[in-house]
């Protein structure tokens, strides 16, 4: 469709110098297959060249692909809660610190900071905010003890910019 639009613009006497493909370059949080940005650019350049638009400068905003891995949220397990249905690690960090899991159901890697002799159990990692949606990760196998330190990695994209003082919590 873009090539059709470029052809219509050219037919109307409008020649562009740049073409901006915006953002949306993927990030591998878990086991997704993310096309390397080089492949995307080479593919775009090839299609533009084949269609007679090789003069266009390609502009892209790499966004999350640059900053996601540059940040992590460090938190401490405050309590271990066990119910007949599920086990929970309640941390001192919550949805006000990292909203993406609660808001978008974003899968974020969670790793223990130290090696532990504690048994590893399937947990939901949740925060201290009085909201049922205050969770950082679901169904993770982690050490089960108060005082454990956890790192929620890949939090550089929108982690700080979307953090808030919701529910009178400090940043």
Task: Locate predicted features.
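Short, well-ordered coil/turn segments that N-cap beta-strands
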Residues: 12-17, 54-56
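Short, well-ordered amphipathic alpha-helical segments that serve as non-catalytic structural scaffolds
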Residues: 2-9, 43-47
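Aromatic/hydrophobic pocket-lining residues that form the small-molecule binding cavity
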Residues: 1-2, 37
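Charged (often Lys/Glu-rich) extended helix/loop segments that serve as interaction or gating elements
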Residues: 43, 54-171
